[in-house]
Amino acid sequence: ETMVRAAQLHRLTGEAAFLDWAAGQMDFYAANFLLWEPQRPGHPARLFWQTLTEATNLVKFADVCRLLAGAVEAERRERWRRELLEPEVRALNSTQQQVHNIALWQRCAVAQVALAVGDEAMWRGAIDGPWGVRRQVAEGVTSDYFWYEQSLGYNAYVAQALLSLGTAAGLAGRADELSHELAVAQNLLLSPLLLRFPDGRLPNPADSRGAARAPDPEVLARSYRVFPTTLGLEEAVRVRDWNTLLDPPPAPPRVGRSPRSR
């Protein structure tokens, strides 16, 4: 996370110190990644205990690579690709050959690496491959927009994977290729409203840390750039972060009253 912030600050300020630190971190991981043993026998994860955590952090490495693209020489970026990003992609592609929330995260992470390094074949495999993003969404989301693994918390979790991918695809001018999948993801964030109890709490049928509530203003605010909602925009206008600096949220639409309520 700090590496991403340093890369962002370099883009914002042009200060070489931020560039040197972020690029130095990428150099370190590239130089050592293949020297580190996998965390567990028979599992390819090297930086973390499981490939899910590798995936959720790989998107940060990909973002740093994108942010520094115009400031780092091509040979250095190629070393990052060859010695860090591509080995991570191979590790993620070797597991989770199924429709699953972890598989979706892993394919989304690989797709973001593909965008960062300009690898069309990698992109096509992550999106349209046998266990790619399209199949994950087509088979993993029910007709009433719930993730099939029966945890309501997974709705937001897989939507966050697609939010990360949608943001990267939008920056690369390729969000239109994912228009259906992103629309489904937005509905994943909204569908729990249909199941909430009168006090806003949600049922907890499966894997969850505790009783959640709907709507979740924080999640909707984080998602406004790709999944704009009235409540999300209302929350986002009060936030000061990288997203709202680059893409200030518009005023939310007014919610008019129906004639019967007047």
Which ranges hold each PLM region?
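Aromatic-lined, polymer-binding surfaces characteristic
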Residues: 1-186, 196
